[in-house]
Amino acid sequence: MARYTGADCKRCRREKTKLFLKGSKCDTPKCPIEIRPYPPGEHGRGRTKDSEYLLQKREKQKCARIYGVLEKQFRGYYDEANRRAGKTGDELLKILESRLDNVVYRGGFAPSRDAARQAVRHGHVQVNGRKVDIPSYRISENDIVEIAPKARELTPFIVARETAGQGRAVPAWLEVIPSQLRILVHSLPARQVIDTQVQEQLIVELYSK
């Protein structure tokens, strides 16, 4: 599957906000967007007034980059959200949050969603006792996500276990048992408990044209 291979920090600067693609570095003064809070390139400091279309497109790109999803798959998620009974923007974020790589990241078992994707692809993650190596696998209510027994002594997971509770907060819809490297999915999140800083209505407006 195709993936973006450019510099992560340039993506954050392009969107003029932190996308939290580099793990703990994003929370330090070394984060490039703290040093250079303007887009990369020769004309990055220039003042331009974005059109309505560009604002909508940038918001879609920002959301897709946060969750590490390329355009074709992102559009598929939007189409699915649009068929659901709830508000399309809310449903889109619920779908993105229910991805396995996101749940591994939210549970604190990886410093970034990219690292979580790698852990899943390498077969280090189980769902309900079975190995799942597809990052886009959709988690359901009452699922149990855990690090596979053979992987629990790998350095990233030792660190995750020993530093549990010291980093970002685990969302209320998940319960983490650090000693077992296990995540209990109590529910799927409502929009009001999703802290992703995106204006999903702009995405809906873009795709509705």
UniProtKB/Swiss-Prot annotation:
The keyword Ribonucleoprotein applies. NCBIfam families: PRK05327.1 (NF003717), rpsD_bact (TIGR01017). Belongs to the universal ribosomal protein uS4 family. Residues 98-164 form the S4 RNA-binding domain. The lineage of its organism: Bacteria, Bacillati, Actinomycetota, Actinomycetes, Frankiales. GO terms for biological process: ribosomal small subunit biogenesis; translation. PROSITE patterns: S4 (PS50889). Disulfide bonds: none annotated. Gene3D superfamilies: Ribosomal Protein S4 Delta 41, Chain A, domain 1, RNA-binding S4 domain. CDD domains: S4 (cd00165). This is Small ribosomal subunit protein uS4. Part of the 30S ribosomal subunit. Contacts protein S5. The interaction surface between S4 and S5 is involved in control of translational fidelity. GO terms for molecular function: rRNA binding; structural constituent of ribosome. The keyword Endoplasmic reticulum does not apply. It comes from the Bacteria. Keywords: Ribonucleoprotein, Ribosomal protein, RNA-binding, rRNA-binding. One of the primary rRNA binding proteins, it binds directly to 16S rRNA where it nucleates assembly of the body of the 30S subunit. InterPro entries: Ribosomal_uS4 (IPR022801), Ribosomal_uS4_bac-type (IPR005709), Ribosomal_uS4_N (IPR001912), S4_RNA-bd (IPR002942), S4_RNA-bd_sf (IPR036986).
